[in-house]
Amino acid sequence: MSWSPSLPTQTCGAWEMKERLGTGGFGNVIRWHNQATGEQIAIKQCRQELSPKNRNRWCLEIQIMRRLNHPNVVAARDVPEGMQNLAPNDLPLLAMEYCQGGDLRRYLNQFENCCGLREGAVLTLLSDIASALRYLHENRIIHRDLKPENIVLQQGEKRLIHKIIDLGYAKELDQGSLCTSFVGTLQYLAPELLEQQKYTVTVDYWSFGTLAFECITGFRPFLPNWQPVQWHSKVRQKSEVDIVVSEDLNGAVKFSSSLPFPNNLNSVLAERLEKWLQLMLMWHPRQRGTDPQYGPNGCFRALDDILNLKLVHVLNMVTGTVHTYPVTEDESLQSLKTRIQENTGILETDQELLQKAGLVLLPDKPATQCISDSKTNEGLTLDMDLVFLLDNSKINYETQITPRPPPESVSCILQEPKRNLSFFQLRKVWGQVWHSIQTLKEDCNRLQQGQRAAMMSLLRNNSCLSKMKNAMASTAQQLKAKLDFFKTSIQIDLEKYKEQTEFGITSDKLLLAWREMEQAVEQCGRENDVKHLVERMMALQTDIVDLQRSPMGRKQGGTLDDLEEQARELYRKLREKPRDQRTEGDSQEMVRLLLQAIQSFEKKVRVIYTQLSKTVVCKQKALELLPKVEEVVSLMNEDERTVVRLQEKRQKELWNLLKIACSKVRGPVSGSPDSMNVSRLSHPGQLMSQPSSACDSLPESDKKSEELVAEAHALCSRLESALQDTVKEQDRSFTTLDWSWLQMEDEERCSLEQACD
């Protein structure tokens, strides 16, 4: 459907006529706009010169459109009141929803699609058109004229939606009409329609297969520039599995059963769709669409299997090759790694699978964890969801990447750039050259993404290392504080012990134990280990900062972008040449751009792999440091527990020493009540019970002396009683503790047992 200039203004109430959208088999399609509500509709009106038979078929199309209801078939609308009166004849108007995206032909003609649509766009198109055809066939409707001009695009909530239009193909397929009205669209018609034979729904299979092939490759499958008669006689010679009949640059006709390159499909989709196209493009209608698994008309179910594939794309950073793996919902990551090992030779244990942000695929999640729906991006994104494969057994990544082999026609002009080609040959081969430069740029960008994913992974490991470094520093400080406290405490204890040995308690075993503690804590601390690790981590940090600051670590653009833009401009100028200027020409300028692009690609790849090797080396250092830091932290924690244990032991020994001292207090010492013979008294007040007559007979001075002695005895008695109560209370407290670990002298043990008795 081609866009036309605006028509003379015409209104019908709030409705205003806008531009002509296109011309169909029966008449014109015009856009109308409601100025009050903003609603837009497409009005299809018939030409006056229709034959009676086609007038009846026009009315039949309107009836069909009004009863259909499917998201991929354009919907009928009510004709606004009064608009029927504007019709040029008595035939009814057909009102339809307006799809602002234009038709598929307009989309295919965009320069970017010269070698086929993007993968996501191909999948959405196949899904939508297959769904629409299924619906029509279930309602016993055969479209018979499926082509890009009869598919329109509507922007949905998440993606573009494709809708089939123009169900009014009802021309009589006599020889005259075929050579006039259908010139340019014959290649979408099934052979049996051209041969005026009986047909079934399989005519739509041929049209759908031809349409799908063009969307994948950018050109029609069978001699697109040949006239109908010669076309028919040559194409019918193809085998049942041939899906391409083309001319090379020398004019030789070639038949092939393979999907041609270039296209934008991954290897798995290309292989599966190649087999599906072989079903759809069979020359004989009885065999067409028959699937080996699903039988006759099983092509739609076979396509469902393809569209429902879940694919994981793995970019091997060692070779630069993308491997695509179909996976099931419950397939484990380990299973995927086994398949990767079979394809790449990289051992499962050495495989590191990174996502774009540098995240490692989780082993406890299924292989589908890295898949997003490629059909929701409308094919606009240039990059598939890639998983980047690194080989952990490698430190130095050598540049092994070479550009993809060019298509056959591009190889020819590389060998003979001065060779003159026809305009149609130039248009095709120049489009392929431009696509080849685009591919070089995209391959370079993917390798750059892989290097950046490795860099992000390094930064994540470095972040973990930094946290562990901080934990190590904190643990080291805590340990140092406890060591300093312990060393200071035991030094003071040793000094005080030495001071009291002349008149106090002595114990060689206790002194030896303290000396051993002092030596034991000297082995704690790990200061040298911590210092060495910090130095290595600081050196690694410097290397990482240098990597981030390096221009090589940033996105590589520049020359390849410029060359791709120059090639696009050359191709655009060729496409837009007026018809009278479409003459032969050579490809020297295009070849020059392609050769420069190849050189630029190889240079950028060397830069990327130099950066990747440095990144891998830094990551290896970080991975080596992580367990060493963990080990040192673990040893420091053990040292801390040792210091705490020694501190507890020393404190228990001090308390035991105090117990021994207290036990000695209960023995005869200078100034004790026993030295004053207080213990021989039956009662502390015995001295006070002497007869008063004896006291009276003493002189006055003797009486005073006797009173002082009695008072002293009383005080001593009370002191002895208080001391005994205190010792008993201490005994009850001490005996609740376990002192079995402390070895005591026999004499001291006996003394303690007597005191307890």
Curated annotation (Swiss-Prot):
Keywords, comma-separated and alphabetical: ATP-binding, Cytoplasm, Hydroxylation, Isopeptide bond, Kinase, Membrane, Nucleotide-binding, Nucleus, Phosphoprotein, S-nitrosylation, Serine/threonine-protein kinase, Transferase, Ubl conjugation
Glycyl lysine isopeptide (Lys-Gly) (interchain with G-Cter in ubiquitin) cross-link, chain position(s): 163
Residues with the Phosphoserine modification: 177, 181, 670, 672, 675, 682, 689, 692, 697, 705, 733, 740
Enzyme Commission code(s) on record: 2.7.11.10, 2.7.11.1
Main location: cytoplasm
Domain Protein kinase residue range list: 15-300
Reactions catalysed according to its record: L-seryl-[I-kappa-B protein] + ATP = O-phospho-L-seryl-[I-kappa-B protein] + ADP + H(+); L-seryl-[protein] + ATP = O-phospho-L-seryl-[protein] + ADP + H(+); L-threonyl-[protein] + ATP = O-phospho-L-threonyl-[protein] + ADP + H(+)
Binding site for ATP: 21-29, 44
Gene Ontology MF terms: ATP binding; IkappaB kinase activity; protein heterodimerization activity; protein homodimerization activity; protein kinase activity; protein phosphatase binding; protein serine kinase activity; protein serine/threonine kinase activity
Quaternary context: Component of the I-kappa-B-kinase (IKK) core complex consisting of CHUK, IKBKB and IKBKG; probably four alpha/CHUK-beta/IKBKB dimers are associated with four gamma/IKBKG subunits. The IKK core complex seems to associate with regulatory or adapter proteins to form a IKK-signalosome holo-complex. The IKK complex associates with TERF2IP/RAP1, leading to promote IKK-mediated phosphorylation of RELA/p65. Part of a complex composed of NCOA2, NCOA3, CHUK/IKKA, IKBKB, IKBKG and CREBBP. Part of a 70-90 kDa complex at least consisting of CHUK/IKKA, IKBKB, NFKBIA, RELA, ELP1 and MAP3K14.
Recorded domain comment: The kinase domain is located in the N-terminal region. The leucine zipper is important to allow homo- and hetero-dimerization. At the C-terminal region is located the region responsible for the interaction with NEMO/IKBKG.
Protein's name in the database: Inhibitor of nuclear factor kappa-B kinase subunit beta
